[in-house]
């Protein structure tokens, strides 16, 4: 028997996620229908709630059974048509929709640590999703679990954690930790290398590293000094390895601890009981333990410094908010801390000020630099009634404005939150690295043991020496750290660089999908064009003059919300408009009504044809206007066509240049519009569009996208984020030209903070560059380990008669991580080609 189960969803961030969950549910034979939004699902069928939840989890998201909720006391004031467009996948932001918590982590050294911490956090009751970022040493946790429970779970897994609620405090603590960590690694590297280098040089020049009766006491002192180095400069490796062992796990620190520990124990055994070893096996490796610890600490220090550079983009955003605001009251003006500013307060801005909160100008004019927020390099003129956003700078002028959004609810705060979430996310390509990392260290230990056994039983004499060298070198050269950093470092740098160009990326998956696109579909109105239609010509027929035709058309359009209506009303200006009775909106056709005793029709040719109004006599004029890219709006009075109003929405100033960039990059460009084919083709020709899909109603846009996808195309849809919601959700990547609007920021896979198609070209270029960088890092890490481990195991011995020195292995290990981080940081200097 069929039943409807209501589920609460978590982890969905855009229309693509909604689509994935819906498809996963509908693929089940026991599901008849699945209605999915970004926060909930209503599923009809015979499947149980547990089965549905498991299906959603397999799709990569979380779900729980919903509890009935009371209906709101007041209905939304959003127009019904907007709600219809948005309801499927694009809910507007709410004041309390951010249930995420951020933790600062310590003690993590490689991708194996990430897996352990993530599993520990996800096992806490109330946690719906946990994202651990090795590059930033942070965790982003979604759900209702308390900070204390989260910290305890991380500590129980053998790592450190600190819950941070305030952004400023988080930044301060993160910087303090980073500086302290770099200082610690620096002195540890100096201490270890100060011992290791002289011992190694002396061994190569003045001694042969072999223990004899004459130098036994000296080597014993060197051994004890090396032990002190291992404790003070490398103690963190051994403590971490011990904690991992207690938790039944193994990490990079386990490999370092085993490699250096075995080398030192062997050397000390030879030092204390040389009689137990044959003469040729009395070689000492104290310098190897000290040098390995020194080089790896040096690598960690350089890596930490490079990681700090990768977070610069986010730090720049955090720097945009001033610490104070200038409050205007009846008593005068005074400076108040930003935390005290509340919505409704009146604030003043003067030249050079940075806007503290979002608001609306009530008095004055000013030029504002919004470059850091939107990527728009040209200052914008703002006056009474215009909105201002936190983080922008007053270049010239003075205004009063009323605060509307403060603290975490400003556009800037939401951007920062979105950037941070994107930097903590993982693309599908990163999941391969995670799977390998989960078993990497145990596999390396097994390889080291097997290699050592082979050399012990089948290798040349002295077997014990070769066995030790092989085991130590294999353990030291293996680097799960490079593997773990490969993806997150590229994501942090790529997402941060995109933000500097005014491009907000919802998650890493969006970057990966955007890098594989081959087709870009544009909504026409407001995307390719200015979105401000203008009446460019009025042609009259019969006995109606231009003023009368314009007056009747404007009277009808008073009741319409269509974009063309505003153009006609603007053209009419201050004309006295007659009263209209019986007004009706005819969807996709136009409007009708009665005025001054006449029956009026205003709309496209299809409307007049449907109402049996002859248009044959004016078809030549209709075609002529349409061929010039204008939309012909026809006016009929008492069943007779009397006027044609040519309405044209001009292309954006940078549309042609942006589309040329996309063409050069190899994308096929498609325009999706409700216009008639003649008008649409004229605009497409002017813009440089390859393909036109015309005459499409709003609810048919998603089907048009689906048709393109059925041809095997990877499709991006560029629209305004509200009217194009179904198409944005259907596309492989939805790109909203949101201009900072709530719905656009909170819902799109990619949001452009400025209304410019150059942002589309920038977004796709950065996506390609980021994925390319990510593949370079992963390939480099795989090649390093694929070649390094066999070489360390002695595969070259039969051909060259040489083995890899453990010290060289330690240097290579440190260098591999530094290389990955440095390569990712190249993205911070990436500039899309013009």
UniProtKB/Swiss-Prot annotation:
Q: Does the keyword Ribonucleoprotein apply?
A: no
Pfam families linked to this entry: E1-E2_ATPase (PF00122), HMA (PF00403), Hydrolase (PF00702)
Enzyme group, top EC level? Answer: translocase
Task: Please write the reaction equations for the catalytic activity of this protein.
Answer: Cu(+)(in) + ATP + H2O = Cu(+)(out) + ADP + phosphate + H(+)
The residue ranges for the Cytoplasmic side of the membrane come to: 2-186, 239-253, 305-437, 485-778, 822-834
* Residues that span the membrane, as ranges: 187-207, 218-238, 254-274, 284-304, 438-458, 464-484, 779-799, 801-821
**Binding residues annotated for Cu(+) 2, in chain numbering:** 110, 113
Q: Which sequence ranges are listed under topological domain Periplasmic?
A: 208-217, 275-283, 459-463, 800
Location of the motif CXXC motif 1: 14-17
Query: Which keywords describe this protein according to UniProt?
Result: ATP-binding, Cell inner membrane, Cell membrane, Chaperone, Copper, Copper transport, Cytoplasm, Ion transport, Magnesium, Membrane, Metal-binding, Nucleotide-binding, Phosphoprotein, Repeat, Translocase, Transmembrane, Transmembrane helix, Transport
* A Gene Ontology molecular function term of the record: P-type monovalent copper transporter activity
Name any GO cellular component annotation. Answer: cytoplasm
Report residues binding Mg(2+): 720, 724
Chain location of the short sequence motif CXXC motif 2 per the record = 110-113
Q: What is its EC number?
A: 7.2.2.8
Tell me which residues make up the HMA domain: 3-64, 99-162
Q: What happens when the gene is disrupted?
A: Decreased resistance to Cu(+). No change in resistance to Zn(2+) or Cd(2+). Decreased resistance to AgNO(3). Increased intracellular levels of Cu(2+).
Q: Does the keyword Metal-binding apply?
A: yes
- State the Gene Ontology BP annotations: cellular response to copper ion; cellular response to silver ion; copper ion export; copper ion homeostasis; copper ion transport; detoxification of copper ion; silver ion transmembrane transport; viral translational frameshifting
Gene3D superfamilies per UniProt: 3.30.70.100, Calcium-transporting ATPase, cytoplasmic domain N, Calcium-transporting ATPase, cytoplasmic transduction domain A, HAD superfamily/HAD-like
UniProt: Cu(+) 1 binding residues: 14, 17
Record family assignment: Belongs to the cation transport ATPase (P-type) (TC 3.A.3) family. Type IB subfamily.
What domain comment accompanies this record? The N-terminal domain (exact residues are not given in the paper) is not required for Cu(+)-binding (when deleted KM for Cu(+) binding is 1.32 uM) nor for ATPase activity, binds 2 Cu(+)/monomer. Contradictory results give a considerable decrease in Cu affinity when residues 1-150 are deleted (KM=31.9 uM for Cu(+)).
Q: How does it assemble?
A: Copper-exporting P-type ATPase interacts with apo-periplasmic copper chaperone CusF; when CusF is precharged with copper it binds very little CopA. The periplasmic loops of CopA, especially the first half of loop 1, play a large role in binding to CusF.
Alphabetized PANTHER family for the sequence? ATP7, ISOFORM B (PTHR43520), COPPER-EXPORTING P-TYPE ATPASE (PTHR43520:SF6)
Please report the name of this protein according to its UniProt entry.
Copper-exporting P-type ATPase
Q: Which organism is it from?
A: Escherichia coli (strain K12)
């Amino acid at each position: 028997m069929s039943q409807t189960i209501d589920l609460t969803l978590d982890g969905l961030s855009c229309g693509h996620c909604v689509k994935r969950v819906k498809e996963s549910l509908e693929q089940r034979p026991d599901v008849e229908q699945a209605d999915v939004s970004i926060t909930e699902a209503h599923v009809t069928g015979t499947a149980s709630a547990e089965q549905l939840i498991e299906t959603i989890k397999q799709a990569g998201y979380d779900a729980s059974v919903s509890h009935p909720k009371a209906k709101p006391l007041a209905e939304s004031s959003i127009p019904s048509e907007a709600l219809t467009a948005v309801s499927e996948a694009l809910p507007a932001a709410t004041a309390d929709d951010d249930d995420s918590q951020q933790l600062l982590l310590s003690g993590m050294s490689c991708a194996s640590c990430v897996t352990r911490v993530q599993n520990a956090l996800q096992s806490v009751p109330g946690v719906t999703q946990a994202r651990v970022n090795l590059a930033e040493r942070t965790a982003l946790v979604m759900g209702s679990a308390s900070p204390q429970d989260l910290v305890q779970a991380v500590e129980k897994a053998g790592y450190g954690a600190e819950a941070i609620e305030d952004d400023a405090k988080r930044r301060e603590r993160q910087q303090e930790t980073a500086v302290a960590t770099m200082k610690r690694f620096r002195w540890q590297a100096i201490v270890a290398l100060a011992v290791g280098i002289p011992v190694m040089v002396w061994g190569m020049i003045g001694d042969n590293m072999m223990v004899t009766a004459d130098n036994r006491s000296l080597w014993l002192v060197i051994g004890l000094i090396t032990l002190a180095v291992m404790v003070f400069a490398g103690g963190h490796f051994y403590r971490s390895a011990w904690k991992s062992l207690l938790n039944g796990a193994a990490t990079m620190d386990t490999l370092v601890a085993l490699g250096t520990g075995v080398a030192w124990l062997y050397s000390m055994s030879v030092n204390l009981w040389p009689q137990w070893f044959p003469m040729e096996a009395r070689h000492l490796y104290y310098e190897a333990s000290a040098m390995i610890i020194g080089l790896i600490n040096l690598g960690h220090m350089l890596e930490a410094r490079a990681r700090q550079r990768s977070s610069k983009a986010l730090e720049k955003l955090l720097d945009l908010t001033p610490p104070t605001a200038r409050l205007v009251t009846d008593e005068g003006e005074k400076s108040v801390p930003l935390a005290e500013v509340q919505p409704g307060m009146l604030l003043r801005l003067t030249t050079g000020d940075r806007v503290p909160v979002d608001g609306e100008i009530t008095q004055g004019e000013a030029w504002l630099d919004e470059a850091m927020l939107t990527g728009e390099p040209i200052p914008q003129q703002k006056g009474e009634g215009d909105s201002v956003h936190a983080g922008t700078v007053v270049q010239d002028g003075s205004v009063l404005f009323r605060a509307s959004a403060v603290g975490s609810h400003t556009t800037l705060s939401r951007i920062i939150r979105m950037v941070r979430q994107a930097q903590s996310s993982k693309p599908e390509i990163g999941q391969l690295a995670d799977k390998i990392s989960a078993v990497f260290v145990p596999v390396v230990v097994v390889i080291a043991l097997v290699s050592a056994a082979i050399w012990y039983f089948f290798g040349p004499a002295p077997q014990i020496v070769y066995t030790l060298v092989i085991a130590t070198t294999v353990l030291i050269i293996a680097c799960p750290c490079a593997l773990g950093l490969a993806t997150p470092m590229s994501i942090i740098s790529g997402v941060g660089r995109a933000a500097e160009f005014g491009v907000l990326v919802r998650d890493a998956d969006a970057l990966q999908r955007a890098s594989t696109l081959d087709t870009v579909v544009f909504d026409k109105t407001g995307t390719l064009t200015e979105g401000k239609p203008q009446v460019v010509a009025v042609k009259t027929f019969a006995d109606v003059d231009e003023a009368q035709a314009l007056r009747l058309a404007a009277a009808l359009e008073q009741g319409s919300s269509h974009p063309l209506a505003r153009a006609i009303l603007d053209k009419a200006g201050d004309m006295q408009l007659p009263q209209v009775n019986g007004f009706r909106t005819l969807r996709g056709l136009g409007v009708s009504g009665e005025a001054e005793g006449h029956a009026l029709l205003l709309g496209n040719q299809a409307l007049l044809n449907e109402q049996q109004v002859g248009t044959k006599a004016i078809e030549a004029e209709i075609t002529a206007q349409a061929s010039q890219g204008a939309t012909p709006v026809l006016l009929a009075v008492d069943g007779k066509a009397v006027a044609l109003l040519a309405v044209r929405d001009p292309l954006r100033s940078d549309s042609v240049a942006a589309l040329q960039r996309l063409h050069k990059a190899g994308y096929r460009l498609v325009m999706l519009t409700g216009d008639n084919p003649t008008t649409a083709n004229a605009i497409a020709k002017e813009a440089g569009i390859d393909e036109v899909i015309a005459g499409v109603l709003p609810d048919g846009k998603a089907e048009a996208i689906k048709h393109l996808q059925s041809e095997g195309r990877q499709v991006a849809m560029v629209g305004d984020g509200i009217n194009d919601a179904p198409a944005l959700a259907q596309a492989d990547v939805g790109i909203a030209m949101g201009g900072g609007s709530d719905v656009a920021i909170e819902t799109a896979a990619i949001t452009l903070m400025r209304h410019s198609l150059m942002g589309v070209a920038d977004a796709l270029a950065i996506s390609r560059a980021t994925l390319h960088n990510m593949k370079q890092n992963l390939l480099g890490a795989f090649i390093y380990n694929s070649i390094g481990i066999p070489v360390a195991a002695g595969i070259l011995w039969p051909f060259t008669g040489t083995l890899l020195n453990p010290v060289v292995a330690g240097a290579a290990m440190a260098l591999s991580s530094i290389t990955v981080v440095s390569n990712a940081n190249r993205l911070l200097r990436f500039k899309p080609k013009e």
